[in-house]
A protein has these predicted regions:
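Aromatic (Trp/Tyr/Phe) and Gly/Pro-enriched flexible surface segments
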Residues: 1-105, 126-206, 210-215
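Short amphipathic, basic-aromatic surface patches that mediate peripheral association
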Residues: 108-123
Length: 215
C-alpha cells in the first residue's frame, strides 16, 4: 500500500519480471502475469481528487495500461516510440546470428494462475493459462533487400521464419524441468550459410499475453 499526496490505499502491483535466488543453479528469472484492474480502479478514485488538468495525465495512463500484463523475457530490443502507436510493435525480436542452431535447452517451472482473464478483465470460466518458451531463426533481409525485424505483430506468422524450437508440454511443473528441443524447419525453408539471420528467444508467463489474456 502507498500514499499518493494523502490518498491512501493505492494498490501497487508486483513486478511481472523479477530475479530469484532459487534457480536450478544460481539465479532465475520469475515471470508472472499480473492483474492490473485493482490498480486501475484506485487510479480512477484518485483522479476524482485532482484538478481537470492533472486528471488528463491519469486518463493517459489508464488508456495505456491493460487489465492484465504478462511477464516476458526476449532476445531483442524495445522501442518505446513504436509502442506508443502500437504496443505490439514495441517488442522487436532477435539479434544478428551466425550459424545454424541445432537445439534449444534450459530449465523451467510453471504454475498457471487460478483465474483466466480476457482483455476486458472478465474471468473466462474453464480456461487454463499456458506459458510459452521458444526460439526462432529468421531471415534478416527481406525480398526487397531491406532489414527485417519481427515484432509482436508477426513473430509467430512471418514468412521469414526458417527454424523454430518450442516447449510444447505446457502443463504445470512444480519442480525444475529440463527441456532440450531440436530446431525444426518452417515455411519450407532451408538454412543457407550465405544468408543473414537473426535469432529470437521468447519466454512469457501467458502465451496470449500479447492479446492481454492470461491468468
Amino acid at each position: 500500500l502507498k500514499s499518493v499526496d494523502g490518498f491512501q490505499d493505492i494498490v501497487i502491483p508486483s513486478w511481472c519480471v523479477r530475479s530469484s535466488e532459487e534457480g536450478k543453479t544460481g539465479k532465475a528469472a520469475v515471470l508472472e502475469t499480473i492483474d492490473l484492474t485493482p490498480s486501475k480502479a484506485d487510479l480512477l478514485r484518485y483522479k476524482e481528487t485532482l484538478s481537470s488538468s492533472d486528471a488528463v495525465f491519469i486518463d493517459y495512463v489508464l488508456g495505456m495500461c491493460p487489465n492484465i500484463t504478462a511477464g516476458s523475457l526476449f532476445l531483442g530490443s524495445f522501442d518505446l516510440a513504436s509502442a506508443m502507436g502500437d504496443p505490439l510493435k514495441g517488442t522487436q525480436f532477435g539479434i544478428p546470428y551466425v550459424g545454424e542452431p541445432v537445439k534449444f535447452s534450459g530449465w523451467y517451472k510453471y504454475t498457471p494462475g487460478a483465474k483466466f482473464y480476457d482483455k476486458d478483465g472478465n474471468v473466462v470460466e474453464g480456461q487454463t493459462d499456458e506459458f510459452a518458451i521458444y526460439a526462432l531463426l529468421y531471415e534478416a533481409k527481406g525480398k526487397d533487400g531491406k532489414e527485417v525485424t519481427l515484432t509482436g505483430t508477426d513473430i509467430n506468422t512471418s514468412e521469414y521464419i526458417v527454424l523454430k524450437a518450442e516447449v510444447t508440454d505446457k502443463t504445470a511443473k512444480e519442480d525444475w524441468t529440463y527441456f532440450e528441443i531440436p530446431f525444426e524447419k518452417m515455411n519450407d525453408k532451408e538454412y543457407d550459410a550465405a544468408n543473414q539471420y537473426k535469432l529470437a528467444l521468447i519466454c512469457t508467463s501467458s502465451k496470449e499475453g500479447d492479446r492481454y489474456r492470461g491468468a
